[in-house]
């Protein structure tokens, strides 16, 4: 997998370094292109991917912690040794990097405290690390509420409309929703709009769990304690919530940036807590109302109900305090020999909710290995035509913050110089290749995939990826990762793999 990704990245990037004519290259450039690709493959030390990934994921490293600072320092060291001109870009951003206080309890008809922490597994020594936090969603509202429960399916706008149509009382109730169907933040937004006072969110086994196949650690699907974390922000912009469209420069720096008053920002007001489906089962199995519509039935072995009934009371307590946190982006540059003011940018975030072995640091490790290989060529005089920038972004998990601040900081320069942006958030996850891209870069991915042999196979990545189709599907770019500011704010052609 790592070989496949490293070469796909190189093939795509190096193709952008050659003057294109219609669907191919000028003849005078083609041989140089092929030689560069061949020399790059010889320069890659694939064992370094594992070395980097092991070092990057030694500790849980959420934004603003000393452990994340160690990751930043390691990346600076590796990229500098590879010959890149490396710069750290600091920003002071407003976010929560700790769950604060959080409790979830059934108050009646029994008293039961529900787990908000993933289970410890003998097969996974990392799961016992005492530094791992409770599961939490950044930018939950704070509050302590006790109320009856309503099952809101995925918590989409349509789900809430259906509940209203069925006459289910929502005001003053606590919602329990399964992940999927929409962005998690909108589950809270729609619950608030309907007068609900709290939200419990979980991944149902029908969507990822024992009904799909073997669960972790035996298989890839969620076990009963697995908790999905993430940002709840539903503002009209990404990045630091107090500095829309302007960089959150350091508070102690020479340039002062206007910051909005947090009290004026449209943060969520209701407490939200994520849990595993084992804990959710304790609530759902005690609900006594009307049966849910057929499409709303989940994977737990009982009939789901719309309401919990008057006897079932649940307490949700969250006390989460955002604060100003120093986020550091690390950007390295190889100066292009022919067009130094034309930039091809690759990036991945490096902050993680826990250890980050897949999301995001498989992408981080790939980019470090990539930098080392290009550095060998660069030192031998084989310089790319255009400048290549590699960015490692901080504070992505709380709302795609670090990369957005950098783009806001360099908006004019990026608009004038950036040729493309390639995002590798979680570069290696499973055995199947997939990508999404701007329309102008989709053919580039297809062409690159035809040049790469699939691991342990005589077929190309393209052939495995396409299967029985003439061509594989490449999705359009949406939200959720660091391509957003490049593509949607500045209009830089982007891809995400």
Description of each model-found segment:
Residues 23-31, 54-171, 205, 217, ...:
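Noncatalytic luminal/extracellular "stalk/propeptide" segments of secretory-pathway proteins
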Residues 35-43, 57-66, 103, 135-140, ...:
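Second-shell loop/turn segments in exported
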Residues 51, 373-401, 421-424:
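Short helix-loop-beta-strand segments that form the rim/entrance of peptidase-like active sites
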Residues 52-55, 87-88, 149-152, 174-178, ...:
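Structural recognition of the beta-strand scaffold that forms the well-ordered cores
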Residues 127-162, 238-358, 369-372, 376-382, ...:
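Soluble metallo-hydrolase cores and metallopeptidase-like ectodomains found primarily
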Residues 1-24:
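Bacterial Sec-dependent N-terminal signal peptides
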């Amino acid at each position: 997998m790592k070989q496949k990704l490293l070469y796909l990245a190189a093939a795509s990037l190096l193709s952008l370094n050659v003057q294109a004519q219609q669907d191919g290259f000028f003849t005078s450039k083609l041989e140089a292109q092929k030689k560069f690709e061949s020399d790059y493959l010889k320069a890659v030390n694939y064992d370094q991917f594992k070395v980097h990934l092991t070092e990057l994921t030694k500790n849980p490293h959420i934004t603003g912690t000393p452990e994340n600072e160690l990751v930043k320092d390691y990346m600076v060291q590796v990229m500098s040794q590879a010959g890149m001109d490396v710069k750290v870009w600091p920003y002071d951003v407003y976010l929560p990097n700790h769950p604060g206080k959080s409790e979830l309890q059934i108050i009646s008809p029994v008293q039961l405290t529900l787990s908000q922490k993933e289970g410890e597994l003998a097969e996974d020594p990392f799961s016992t690390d005492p530094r791992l936090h409770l599961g939490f969603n950044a930018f939950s509202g704070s509050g302590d509420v006790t109320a009856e429960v309503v099952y809101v399916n995925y918590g989409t706008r349509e789900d809430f409309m259906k509940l209203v149509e069925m006459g289910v009382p929502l005001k003053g109730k606590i919602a329990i929703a399964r992940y999927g169907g929409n962005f998690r933040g909108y589950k809270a937004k729609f619950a608030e709009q309907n007068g609900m006072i709290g939200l419990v969110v979980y991944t149902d086994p029908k969507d990822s769990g024992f009904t799909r196949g073997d669960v972790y650690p035996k298989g890839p699907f969620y076990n009963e304690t697995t908790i999905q974390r993430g940002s709840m922000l539903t503002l009209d912009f990404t990045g630091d919530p107090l500095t829309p469209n302007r960089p959150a420069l350091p508070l102690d720096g020479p340039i002062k940036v206007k910051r909005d008053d947090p009290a004026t920002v449209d943060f969520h007001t209701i407490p939200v807590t994520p849990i595993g489906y084992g804990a959710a089962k304790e609530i759902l199995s005690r609900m006594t109302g009307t049966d849910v519509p057929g499409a709303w039935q989940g994977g737990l072995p009982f009939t789901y109900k719309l309401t919990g009934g008057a006897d079932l009371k649940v307490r949700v307590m969250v006390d989460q305090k955002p604060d100003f946190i120093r986020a550091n982006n690390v950007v390295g540059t190889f100066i292009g020999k022919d067009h130094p003011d034309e930039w091809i940018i690759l990036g991945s975030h490096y902050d993680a909710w826990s250890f980050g072995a897949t999301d995001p640091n498989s992408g981080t490790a790939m980019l470090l290995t990539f930098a080392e290989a290009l550095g060998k060529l660069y030192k031998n005089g084989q310089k790319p035509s255009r400048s290549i920038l590699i960015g490692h972004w901080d504070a992505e998990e709380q709302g795609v913050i670090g990369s957005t601040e950098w783009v806001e900081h360099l908006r004019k320069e990026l608009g004038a110089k950036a040729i493309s942006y390639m995002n590798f958030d979680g570069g290696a996850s499973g055995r199947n290749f997939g990508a999404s891209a701007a329309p102008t870069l989709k053919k580039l991915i297809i062409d690159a995939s035809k040049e790469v042999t699939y691991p342990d196979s005589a077929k190309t990545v393209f052939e495995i990826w396409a299967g029985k189709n003439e061509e594989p599907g490449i999705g359009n770019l949406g939200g959720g990762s660091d391509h957003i500011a490049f593509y949607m704010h500045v209009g830089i052609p982007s891809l995400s793999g």
